[in-house]
Amino acid sequence: MKIFVYHTPEETPTENMPDCAIAVDVLRATTTMATAIYAGAEAVQVFSDIEELMTVSEKWSADKRIRVGERGGKKVEGCDEGNSPLNFTSETVKGKRLFMTTTNGTRCLKRIQNAKVVLAAALVNRRSVVEYLKENQPETIWILGSGWEGSYSLEDTVCAGAIAHSLLAETNSLSDENVGNDEVFGAMSLYLQWQDKLHELMNHASHGQRLQRLECYEDLKYCSQIDILDVLPMQKEIGVLS
């Protein structure tokens, strides 16, 4: 195995796709995806733009779909829900498909949609991702942060570090030959420094501060929890995870 960490979709190579690509958007898209699928959603279908989401979702009956739209941390007008994972309970989502577009996370998934295996990871389902990687041992792994509109994010980097460190430590693979770029060491170092203070780190992060201004305090607490959901959102067809 060789692991690469990229802080934003824009940083990834354009010529080759890895054996396994992992999208991370801790605040909040991949946390929401993991939560919704764990709660019984039929699938999550991602879109880069709102117009396409509305057009495609119109083909589904209203009682079988949930339109999820977020821009700048706020719910998009015309959508049923914004991007708060706390809204996606089993009562809300069971048997329904989420049609989802967000500022950063869905763009991240679009960038890697042609990889052999595409996963969605957050802190809440870190363990499920690590166990999949240990079992399947993909030759090349990209862990791709969503960032914020093309910029670095603390929360996605600490999650990438949590995945990379657990995987390499538990497979006795913590050597240079398994590390594809410097960003892997940087991400692992961030995680090891903050692993017992993840909620505090979220509050320091620029997007965490943005969500505080929107009074999304409970979202920040929830997204900071690690290994609480045994769920592995995986792309089954282009743009559709379940």
UniProtKB/Swiss-Prot annotation:
Keywords for the protein's UniProt record, in alphabetical order: Hydrolase, Magnesium
Transmembrane segments: none
Signal peptide: none
Catalytic activity, reaction form: (2R)-O-phospho-3-sulfolactate + H2O = (2R)-3-sulfolactate + phosphate
Main enzyme class: hydrolase
Cofactor(s) needed by this chain: Mg(2+)
One GO MF term attached to the UniProt entry: 2-phosphosulfolactate phosphatase activity
EC code(s) of this entry: 3.1.3.71
Family to which the UniProt record says this protein belongs: Belongs to the ComB family.
HAMAP family per record: ComB (MF_00490)
NCBIfam families: PRK00886.1-5 (NF002056)
Name the record gives this protein: Probable 2-phosphosulfolactate phosphatase
Organism: Trichodesmium erythraeum (strain IMS101)
